[in-house]
Regions:
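Conserved alpha-helix/loop element of class I SAM-dependent methyltransferases that forms part
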Residues: 1-18
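Conserved class I S-adenosyl-L-methionine
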Residues: 19-26
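Class I SAM-dependent methyltransferase SAM/SAH-binding core
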Residues: 29-76
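A conserved beta-strand element that flanks and buttresses the S-adenosyl-L-methionine
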Residues: 89
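A short, conserved alpha-helix within the catalytic core of class I
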Residues: 97-106
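Conserved beta-strand signature within the Rossmann-like core of class I S-adenosyl-L-methionine
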Residues: 112-120
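Short, glycine-/aromatic-enriched active-site segment of Class I SAM-dependent methyltransferases
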Residues: 121-140
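Short alpha-helix
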Residues: 140-157
């Protein structure tokens, strides 16, 4: 499952009347944000990179939406929200997470209903290639086996409410509260 498939699956799951507010963690250039605003969801876009939030904001500003939208420049792990969200989308984020259990526990507390997460797998040529590239850049990279993922979910106390879908590049996780 490539990122486009993750994106399409996440949009289809969120496209329900039960989901009204969405947090997009690591929103990048805002592709998912725009789609969710088109679906009339209230969206909070969080990213640690100011340039990504600028691109997202410009994209949103160029369109007309009736939904609420805000950006937050922050490290998700360190940010405290004054509200919870019906759904949280986490794509391309766990690659950089040193303590996945703490992040999973925070996600559970910040979500009212559902969480959609892409998790990078540790198998195959692409995983090997990423390891080499990130090592050359002296950048930490975290990849997961199915067993390590299950252990993290159990340690975070959310394994029983989790659906794990194996993909060619890793895993797509849905946590339903």
């Amino acid at each position: 499952m490539c990122l486009k498939k993750f994106f399409l699956n996440t949009v289809s799951f969120i496209n329900t009347d039960a989901i009204k507010t969405v947090l997009d963690i690591g929103c990048g250039p805002g592709h998912l944000v725009v789609k969710l605003l088109e679906l009339e969801k209230d969206v909070t876009a969080l990213d640690i990179a100011p340039n990504m939030l600028s691109i997202t904001q410009a994209r949103v500003d160029s369109m007309t939406f009736s939904s609420n939208f805000e950006t937050i420049l922050a490290d998700y792990s360190a940010h405290e929200f004054d509200k919870t969200f019906d759904a949280i989308s986490v794509m391309g984020f766990f690659d950089y997470v040193q303590d996945p259990v703490a992040v999973l526990q925070k996600l559970i507390s910040d979500a009212n209903k559902e969480i959609y997460i892409s998790i990078p797998g540790d198998k195959g040529f692409l995983a090997w290639q990423r390891r080499v590239r990130y090592k050359q850049r002296n950048c930490p990279l975290y990849l997961y086996s199915r067993d390590s993922l299950v252990q993290h979910l159990q340690d975070a106390g959310c394994y029983e409410m989790t659906e794990i879908i194996d993909t060619e590049r890793g895993f797509y996780i849905i946590i339903r509260k």
